[in-house]
Structures are given as C-alpha cells and as structure tokens.
Amino acid sequence: MKIKAAAVVLIFLAAGLLFDTGLAQGIRKPVWAGQFYESDPTRLAYLIDSFLQAANPSSVQGQIVGLVSPHAGYIYSGQIAAHGYQLVRNLDISTVVIIGPSHQVGFEGCSIYLKGSFQTPLGLAAVAEILAG
C-alpha cells in the first residue's frame, strides 16, 4: 500500500514538473536563463553580438561539417564559442543538433525532446521533429 501511495505522489510530482517546464504545451521553458546566460533579450543579444564582434578566428582549410562548442555559462565560454560560430555564420545551415548533459536529473542513456520548441530569451527554437522522432 505504501508503494502505491508513493507511486501516486511521484506521478503527481512528475506531472507538475511537466507543466512547470511547459512540456504539456510542447514548449520547453528555459531553466537556466538568468543564471548561465542573460534572461533579458536585449542584454543577451548585446552580449552575443559583443562576443561575435570580438571573435577573429583563423581561417579553416576545407569544408566545415560540424562544430563542437562549449556550453558553459556565457561569462566563461561565450567568447570561445563565438570563434566557432563566426566560422559558420555565413554558411547555409538548416538544422543544428545540440548535445549536452542534463544539469537537473542524472540518468543513463540520452534524452531526446521529440516535438515542440525550446523557449529562449530570444524566441522559440523549434525541434526538428522528423530527425528527433
């Protein structure tokens, strides 16, 4: 009986998390905005533009087919990331695959957000549902 009660409580808690993060509406709310990066769109855009303007990466011989970029807080890794993004800024890129660790829950394997969008301070980033599914 205690196990059933605990299971019911866990289900309600999990459902609450879905609504808090916007998963029920298909929009994943930002969890770290204001901590790892600016939550204010104007300030975030200015910070990103500043990093990109200061970046002057060396040219790359050959075709760029992928980019590995740090994902730490922008104050720590933004300038380094900007060097990579400057290299691909003018390329015709239709899909970006973002791979990163979970900072909220530990688990084995991987998790793929199958459909919807990620809310960012700069707007929605749609999931490529055909690739995700």
Where does each model-flagged region fall?
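Bacterial N-terminal signal peptides that target proteins for export
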Residues: 1-9
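Active-site histidine-anchored catalytic micro-motif
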Residues: 25-133
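Sec/Tat signal peptide C-region and signal peptidase I cleavage site
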Residues: 19-24
